[in-house]
Amino acid sequence: MTLGSKKRIQLMLQYIDIKPSDVLLDVGGNTGKITEVYAKECKAVVVLEPKHAVVEYGRTYRPHIKFVEGRVENIPLPDEYFDKVVASASFHHFPNQDRGLEEMKRILKANGKMIILEIDPTTGRGKRLKVCESILHTKAKFYEPFQLRKKVEEHGMKVLSVKSTSLGYYLTAVKGNQK
């Protein structure tokens, strides 16, 4: 677990507001270690992960969680299936962030919530992470909170809140009744 995981989990649970009837998708959930906490709170949880080896590990060591191999730009899951979609410290890694937002919106039920935890590139921690990402030659793209808010709104989602934390910021948005 990374990014102060224990604290991050507590904050995510607070912002996600999981209901026992919820079906939740964790985008870029890796091996499902954090997802395991969500699984205790909701009806069903799915991890979407692009790396085959990571998916196999998750399936082996967390058989109670469904792992789906795939990319956020083309989520291999049905329309309007999930009550909540969580992207915890993964959005900056999406190769095509606009397409990723469209797909996350597509698989959300009407009035479903999207929760994104991201690193704020204007903070000391965010600046250090950007340097690390550039050293590792990743193509990470970070947004300041107001920029991500605008991007999410451009995709037809209603932003309910953007809250800064010591770990970055949380953006919570809701999908309206439209498809």
Stretches with model-predicted labels:
Residues 171-179:
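C-terminal lobe and adjacent flexible extensions of AdoMet/dcAdoMet transferase-like proteins
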Residues 1-6, 33-34, 48, 115-172:
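C-terminal alpha-helical "lid/dimerization" subdomain adjacent to the S-adenosyl-L-methionine
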Residues 23, 111-113:
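Short glycine-centered segments of the SAM/dcSAM-binding site in methyltransferase folds
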Residues 89-90:
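Short catalytic micro-motifs in class I SAM-dependent methyltransferases
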Residues 3-20:
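Conserved alpha-helix/loop element of class I SAM-dependent methyltransferases that forms part
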Residues 86:
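A conserved beta-strand element that flanks and buttresses the S-adenosyl-L-methionine
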Residues 25, 30-74:
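Class I SAM-dependent methyltransferase SAM/SAH-binding core
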Residues 98-110:
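A short glycine-rich, Lys/Arg-flanked "PGG" loop and its adjoining helix->strand segment in the class I
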